[in-house]
Amino acid sequence: MYSESLSNDNYDKFTSDLFNGFDSILTENGVVIYNISYGNENPTQMWTCIADVCKNTNFTIAEAIVWKKKSALPNNTSCNKLTRICEFVFVLCRKDEYMTFNCNKQVVSTRSSGQKMYENIFNLVVAPNNDGACEINKAAYSSELCEKLLALYAPNNALVYDPFMGTGTTAVACKRMGLRYIGSEISPKQCEYANNRLKGVKTQLSLF
């Protein structure tokens, strides 16, 4: 169980334990999409955490995607730190599936040799910060971000698992896209909020 009071080393271990759990349930050539950031109180935590996963689990980094948000508030009060309008989203796959993990890139042409040429998709995603203010979760991301990432990596009819479901943003994106989903959340308030939120979400025929 995650706790805000975890030390740096314990947080790294918690994350590695989480990924070892993922290894037992993730389908062949599936990926884990993991958003993580850092704060001034611990600027190295993000890097040590991901490094620990790569060292102590069966996973490695497949992609490092930059999520550019629409706004960065509150205004910066630091004399030397830049205003952070971007966060990282790491895509991790099993080490022995690095060359075969699923990505929904489309073939745009085929050379005479038979070599397939694929569309260019850049490792930058522009999406809103969140789906609006939420009093019970200040750290929610946007369903648009989820939809864009799932469009890249989720096969048709995929089953998506979010171990920190929160207010249900991942589930909202999945429901719109016609994907199946499972979520875990220890907060009863957020579970209730997510269930009520999902009642008003309809599956859309196409993403764009």
Predicted features and spans:
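Core catalytic lobe of class I
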Residues: 1-193
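S-adenosyl-L-methionine
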Residues: 195-208
